[in-house]
From Swiss-Prot:
Pathway where it operates: Cell wall biogenesis; peptidoglycan biosynthesis
Phylogenetic classification of the source organism: Bacteria, Pseudomonadati, Bacteroidota, Bacteroidia, Bacteroidales
Protein's recorded name: UDP-N-acetylmuramoylalanine--D-glutamate ligase
Entry function: Cell wall formation. Catalyzes the addition of glutamate to the nucleotide precursor UDP-N-acetylmuramoyl-L-alanine (UMA).
GO process annotations (BP): cell division; cell wall organization; peptidoglycan biosynthetic process; regulation of cell shape
Catalytic activity annotation: UDP-N-acetyl-alpha-D-muramoyl-L-alanine + D-glutamate + ATP = UDP-N-acetyl-alpha-D-muramoyl-L-alanyl-D-glutamate + ADP + phosphate + H(+)
């Protein structure tokens, strides 16, 4: 009997373990951290052996195949040992893809992928299609394949997940953009990160579709290298050479495969970045044959994504916006660009090799003050202090950051949490960071 070992027992790992067990493999799960009770219960209910708090190498190195959590780096010592002895190391998505014939609509990009994924899922769901949501959001793809049946899966893919995917095929691949992110995981080499993102197109055939932002210089440069077999569906803000989706005369237009149009002001999501998200989602739905009426309705009634430019409250004339999902500089750029008042920006956290020059002009133009929130704010001081803005340095947590921002903000201004950084220095996740922000804003 083939032995499958799963490293990491979160949503992805626990789901992969259930699918492996259901498919008749000897299955073992190992997690260096504590396993959440709900995942222990899931594993126990399927009689799957597990360990937590350590990795017992003799129980792992004898695997025929290993499924690893996206959070484990490829250069972790245990992963290097497995690779050195020739043991295949794959992702949960790669494993799950072997056991379903569903159509796969996969979305990646440095920014916008969660909103676009959620929006595509909303359109498909609103059209009464049998669809699952998976990847970075939703339930584990492997668990859904094991326990449910769907005709379509809408899957958000990070570069970490794409790294360990080899034979998986996206029927529709969406690449929103590529800007520097996670370079600490890619030897601080931008090309390594670009290569990871472009893995979403591997294995695509002439029957498949590749949707991408036409104005992204990196994507355009890489397209010339790759010679893709899939049909290309570029989108842009305005009508231009090659773009099949764009805005013209305040109207959203998609020209292929079926002509579609709607008034831009009817889109539920506002802002330039959200226009791109809506265009990519509209093309995806169009390719799936969803009616124009259903696409229009879903694009106009979508509620948005938590922690992404989420309006929290207005306190004594000051607006508070939660953009905790902005874990890189480019995300913060989009957030600042959308601000219509002077802004107190809360930023900081675990720096991933950030270059803050991208937001320099916007910070000078839009910000009235800055709050640095993190255990190590030296890089922020070195870059931003020269702007001469009032600064608060907070190393204790979100409560103090919110109170500091509130004191710095004037009536009619906005406090924006858009950190540019990962959350893991002071918080469990970007969700935890955003939830704490909302909690302490509401306590003001």
């Amino acid at each position: 009997m083939k032995r499958i070992v799963i490293l990491g027992a979160g949503e992805s790992g626990a789901g992969a373990a259930v699918l492996a067990k259901v498919k008749g493999f000897e299955t073992f799960v190992s997690d260096m951290s504590a396993i959440k009770d709900k995942y222990k219960d899931l594993l126990d209910s399927h009689h799957i052996a597990w360990e937590e708090g350590h990795h017992t190498e003799e129980l792992i190195l004898n695997a025929d195949e290993v499924i690893k959590s996206p959070g484990i780096p490829n250069d972790a010592p245990l992963i290097l040992k497995l690779k050195a002895q020739g043991t295949p190391v794959i992702s949960e998505i790669e494993f799950a893809g072997r056991y379903t014939d569903a159509k796969m609509i996969c979305i990646t990009g440095s920014n916008g992928k969660t909103t676009t994924t959620s929006l595509i899922y909303h359109i498909f769901k609103s059209a009464d299609l049998n669809v699952g949501l998976a990847g970075n959001i939703g339930k584990s793809l492997a668990l859904q394949v094991a326990e449910e049946h769907h005709d379509y899966y809408i899957i958000e893919l990070s570069s970490f997940q794409l790294d360990n995917m080899y034979n998986f095929r996206a029927n529709i691949a969406v690449l929103m953009n590529i800007t520097p992110d996670h370079l600490d995981r890619y030897d601080h080499c931008m090309q390594n990160y670009i290569d990871a993102k472009f893995r979403i197109t591997q294995n695509q055939t002439t029957d498949d579709a590749f949707i991408f932002w036409n104005d992204d210089p990196i994507i355009k440069q890489e397209l010339a290298k790759h010679g893709l077999k899939a049909h290309l569906y570029p989108f842009a803000a305005v009508k231009e050479d090659g773009a099949i989706a764009y805005v013209e005369d305040h109207e959203v237009k998609i020209t292929e495969p079926i002509a579609f149009n709607m008034e831009q002001e009817e889109l539920a999501l506002t802002g330039q970045h959200n226009l791109y998200n809506s265009l990519a989602a509209g093309i995806s739905a169009n390719l799936a044959g969803i009616t124009k009426e259903n696409i229009r309705k879903a694009l106009s009634d979508f509620k948005g994504v938590e922690h992404r430019l989420e309006k929290v409250a207005r306190v004594r004339g000051i607006d508070f916006i939660n953009d905790s999902k902005a874990t890189n500089v480019n995300s913060c750029w989009y957030a600042l660009q959308s601000m219509t008042t002077k802004t107190v920006l809360i930023l900081g956290g675990k720096d991933k090799g950030n270059d803050y020059t991208e937001i320099e002009d916007l910070v000078r133009e839009k910000c009235s003050a800055l709050v640095y929130l993190g255990l190590h704010n030296e890089k922020l001081h070195a870059f931003f202090d020269r702007f001469g803005l009032p600064v608060a340095d907070v190393q204790t947590g979100m409560k103090d950051a919110v109170e500091a921002a509130y004191k710095l903000a004037k009536k009619g201004e906005t406090v924006l949490l858009s950190p540019c950084c990962a959350s893991f220095d002071l918080f469990k996740s970007y969700e935890d960071r955003g939830d704490q922000f909302k909690k302490y804003v509401r306590e003001l």
